Amino acid sequence: RLCEGLPFTTSAVLTCVAYINGAYQGVHHLRERIDELELARLHGVPPRRITILEDRSELYRGDSADIRRFNRLMGRTERWDGLDPAWLDTLEAQLDVSGFLTYMASQMILGNMDWPKQNVKYWRYTGPPRPEAPLDGRWRFIMGDSDLGFGANAGPDADLFATVRDAGVPVSRLFLAMMRSPELRKRFVDAGLGLLDGPLSPERCMAVLDGMAAQMAPEMDRHTARWRKPADRAQWEREVQLMRDYAQRRAVHARRQLNAYTWRR
């Protein structure tokens, strides 16, 4: 929910109580499945015109020729000195650069420890390019599973910038190559600072977190009795408090890391 409305693909979510044949199954988060069928439905195009790659440039759905297309883009960007404006124009024509930089900054700020070596998906429309986004044929990234973020596996001072630097996977390789460009470095830092002052500010993070916790709280006695995960309501409340601590303290560390360029080689 924190990333809804940002310039990359997200999946809608609904917190609900589930029953199967009348038996109580507890609190679940019903999430929109982002695949070629859903992207096609959202944008009014045939599913066969959608390619989705994941993780290490592996085909999830669509045309396998797009693996080579993406790898060429990554390889040529890695050979770029970061200064030639001609390649920046080419990069902009093949990748939604602003969306990608915002996606990278969001993942790092949210502290997603189950990324970038997995839970990475990116897609493009393969039909005749249209002038309007997102059907212009450019690669766009999808915010995937992030349940190991927001303090789940690391504190608010976690250096996700260093994690990206050391990951050695396509998404991090492309990002690091782009960071050779002074212009793109500035755009990335500006995107991150903009997130910290707006959509991912401590105030908004706290508001969204407290709203979701308030929605779930009436069910947590029954939910924990059913699953024992968390063990009981008190354990759930402690875990929510860890997330509150992350929401309140992450911005200070992320801002320092952005300004210090700790993600650079």
Which stretches of residues belong to each language-model region?
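Short, small/polar residue-rich loop motifs at catalytic or cofactor-binding pockets
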Residues: 11-12
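ATP/NTP phosphate-donor binding region
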Residues: 35
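Catalytic cores of eukaryotic secretory-pathway lumenal/extracellular enzymes that build
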Residues: 41-48
